[in-house]
């Protein structure tokens, strides 16, 4: 059965320039309403960010798609996500690559996301409660790193965990934030500014 809301959202994403069909298929397969509170279920397929509690949000579908597309993933990519949040972005990634590592600083959110992902029968994901600024050193290096909260500057620890030829996509800034792509080439880092965005801040440390 075709879900009209999903198809409408996918059409909007195509109009906004999203071209990766594998990505669009993944977004079609992942039920966004599974990752939000019942009070916001009627807005699950609106192209907007929604609150998930504890001062955090589930990102606007366009931003999820844009950031994922910029990673230029292939099935064998080793991916690190900083900021598991609701688990929605994690689920999209899990449909595209063999394995995803995801770090969340808020224990309650990490537990909730882990439960949701298990209910969707997604088992190619490792989650960890920890400080996103530090990444996940023992699992690196990574071909792709996606950061779903905004640090004021690019964390050096994450740059160090990016493999040769790898790509990191993240929002950077305080009051004025810009979606940024970092590519590691021959031991150097090429940094590109993509577009203006608005994210919650990437807070240091972890919260029980």
Swiss-Prot record:
Record's keyword terms, sorted: Cytoplasm, Methyltransferase, S-adenosyl-L-methionine, Transferase
Catalytic activity: [protein]-L-isoaspartate + S-adenosyl-L-methionine = [protein]-L-isoaspartate alpha-methyl ester + S-adenosyl-L-homocysteine
GO BP terms in the entry: methylation; protein modification process; protein repair
UniProt cross-references to PANTHER family, sorted A to Z: PROTEIN-L-ISOASPARTATE O-METHYLTRANSFERASE, PROTEIN-L-ISOASPARTATE(D-ASPARTATE) O-METHYLTRANSFERASE
Gene3D superfamilies, alphabetized: Vaccinia Virus protein VP39 (3.40.50.150)
Lineage: Bacteria, Pseudomonadati, Pseudomonadota, Gammaproteobacteria, Enterobacterales
InterPro entries according to UniProt: PCMT, SAM-dependent_MTases_sf
Predominant localisation class: cytoplasm
GO MF, one annotated term: protein-L-isoaspartate (D-aspartate) O-methyltransferase activity
Active-site residues, record numbering mapped to chain: 59
Top-rank taxon: Bacteria
Function: Catalyzes the methyl esterification of L-isoaspartyl residues in peptides and proteins that result from spontaneous decomposition of normal L-aspartyl and L-asparaginyl residues. It plays a role in the repair and/or degradation of damaged proteins.
Protein name: Protein-L-isoaspartate O-methyltransferase
Localization annotation: Cytoplasm
């Amino acid at each position: 059965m075709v879900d009209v809301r999903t198809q409408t959202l996918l059409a909007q994403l195509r109009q906004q320039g999203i071209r990766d069909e594998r990505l669009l298929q993944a977004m079609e397969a992942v039920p966004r309403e599974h990752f939000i509170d019942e009070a916001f279920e009627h807005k699950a397929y609106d192209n907007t960010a929604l609150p998930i509690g504890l001062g955090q949000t589930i990102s606007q579908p366009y931003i999820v798609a844009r950031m994922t597309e910029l990673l230029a993933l292939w099935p064998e990519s080793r991916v690190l996500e900083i900021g598991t949040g609701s688990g929605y972005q994690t689920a999209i990634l899990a449909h595209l690559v063999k394995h995803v590592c995801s770090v969340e600083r808020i224990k309650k959110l990490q537990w909730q996301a882990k439960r949701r992902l298990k209910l969707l029968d997604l088992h190619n994901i490792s989650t960890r409660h920890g400080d996103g600024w530090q990444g996940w050193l023992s699992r690196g290096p990574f071909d792709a790193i996606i950061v779903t909260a905004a640090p004021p500057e690019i964390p050096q620890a994450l740059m160090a965990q990016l493999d040769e030829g790898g790509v990191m996509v993240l929002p950077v800034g305080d009051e004025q934030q810009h979606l940024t792509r970092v590519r590691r080439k021959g031991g150097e880092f090429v940094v590109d500014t993509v577009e203006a965005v608005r994210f919650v801040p990437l807070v240091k440390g972890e919260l029980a």
